[in-house]
């Protein structure tokens, strides 16, 4: 298999949305674990709303939205979290907080996972996104 064929097979495997998103979420979860966090939930749902990851970093509850892109279909994953998505994340986080009885310290992170043409992966973490207004950590 030459390099072009290899890239095409990799692109096809990674470009299926369910595969691409799930792999990105697993990579993001692994990064949080390596940093000492505990993953409390993956793909947690409240009605139609979903939080990709819920993690605990020390005493801080972290709600994580993961955006995974391939190099050829790039674009900033962070920019894909538009107002509609932010509203859904707020609703889901409020549902989680209600379910557990609240948390004194929490934050939102957005993690971008970029699968490069050479097969390598770059992960960029945006910590403390102010989806509720002022940060609470």
Describe the predicted segments one by one.
Residues 1-42:
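Acidic-basic catalytic patches of nuclease active cores, encompassing PD-(D/E)XK
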Residues 48, 61-63, 105, 123:
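Structural motif
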Residues 74-104:
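Mid-chain, well-packed structural core segment of small domains
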Residues 32, 51-74, 81, 89:
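Conserved catalytic cores of phosphodiester-cleaving nucleases, focusing on short active-site segments
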């Amino acid at each position: 298999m030459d390099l072009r064929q290899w890239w095409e097979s990799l692109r096809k495997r990674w470009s299926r949305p369910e595969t691409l998103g799930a792999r990105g979420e697993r990579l993001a979860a692994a990064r949080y674990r390596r940093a000492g966090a505990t993953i409390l939930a993956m793909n947690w749902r409240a009605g139609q709303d979903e939080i990709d990851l819920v993690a605990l970093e020390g005493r801080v509850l972290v709600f994580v939205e993961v955006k995974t892109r391939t190099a050829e279909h790039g674009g900033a994953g962070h920019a894909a979290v538009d107002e509609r998505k932010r509203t859904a994340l707020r609703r889901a986080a409020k549902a989680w907080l209600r379910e557990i009885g609240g948390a004194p310290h929490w934050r939102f992170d957005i993690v971008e996972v970029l699968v490069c043409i050479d097969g390598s992966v770059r992960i960029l973490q945006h910590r403390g996104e102010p989806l509720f207004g002022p940060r609470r950590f």
